[in-house]
């Protein structure tokens, strides 16, 4: 779409869409769940075990122990030994939804934990292999969560739920594992950059990585949009300037879903941006396949962050 017709302009300004409708049309494609959480027996009088696995809603937010069960669709690439490094639990958002969380201990004693907000058409089961591979290669542990309506998280996906979901996951990571903000690298991919930018604009952390980010929902739907309207959704462009932590922006020059111009615009608007990574020829879903992706992440986390703290 190269511009807005008179009819489209009339529709926008006479009957503007609400942000929730823009968000729903642009972003949310939750897959069929590729995993389940199985409660592990808790010691108790008479050897009482855990509640039935179907009782997830009632147990959301409790400190019970859970075991990850991956379905074949998750396409897990590692052995049982690696699977055993994955801890899963449930927490509850301020909007009342059960949020599924995952902590992957890739590197004992790792300096940083990457807090990963994933893309729009995957869940934790599908991402688990990637998290193990990423963490071991960049020497970090990985924490992630599923948005409302994804995986075993309850509720429906929405912009408001995105913000509540990441808040709940942030608090769970900090309280459950005692990890301080200066040891957390917030990482958002695609739609995951929306909650990541929102959280990073409100809390300081070690660093932020924005992978194939969008400036706003309207700018994705209508590329010639130059300003942020009150009915826009996902207004990253209005929040990124409030981030006080170092920000690495990664984008493919041939991104067919979120145009490369979005990454450029956010880079220009972000006062804390470091040297970006523009991956020549990469699209929306294949940046990780290029060697410079891991090289840039390693340099950012192992060299640039420690030097900034010195």
Swiss-Prot record:
The keyword Secreted is annotated on this UniProt entry? no
Q: Can you say where in the cell this protein is located?
A: Cell membrane; Endosome membrane; Cell projection, Dendritic spine; Postsynaptic density membrane
Phosphoserine occurs at which residues?
A: 307
List the keywords (alphabetical): Cell membrane, Cell projection, Endosome, Hydrolase, Lipoprotein, Membrane, Palmitate, Phosphoprotein, Postsynaptic cell membrane, Synapse
Which Gene Ontology BP terms does the record give? Answer: regulation of postsynapse organization
**What topology does it adopt in the membrane?**
Lipid-anchor
Coiled-coil spans in chain: none
Enumerate the catalysed reactions: S-hexadecanoyl-L-cysteinyl-[protein] + H2O = L-cysteinyl-[protein] + hexadecanoate + H(+)
EC class, as a word, reads: hydrolase
The record ties this protein, via Gene3D superfamilies, to: alpha/beta hydrolase (3.40.50.1820)
Q: What is its EC number?
A: 3.1.2.22
**UniProt-listed InterPro entries:** AB_hydrolase_fold, Hydrolase_4
How is this chain modified after translation?
Palmitoylated on cysteine residues located in a cysteine cluster at the N-terminus which promotes membrane localization. Palmitoylation is required for post-synaptic localization and for depalmitoylating activity towards DLG4/PSD95.
Q: A single Gene Ontology molecular function, please?
A: palmitoyl-(protein) hydrolase activity
Q: Which GO CC terms are listed, alphabetically?
A: dendritic spine; endosome membrane; plasma membrane; postsynaptic density membrane
Top-level taxon: Eukaryota
Tell me which family the UniProt entry assigns to this protein: Belongs to the AB hydrolase superfamily. ABHD17 family.
- State its role: Hydrolyzes fatty acids from S-acylated cysteine residues in proteins. Has depalmitoylating activity towards NRAS. Has depalmitoylating activity towards DLG4/PSD95. May have depalmitoylating activity towards MAP6.
Name this polypeptide is given? Alpha/beta hydrolase domain-containing protein 17A
* UniProt source species: Bos taurus
Give me the gene this protein comes from.
ABHD17A
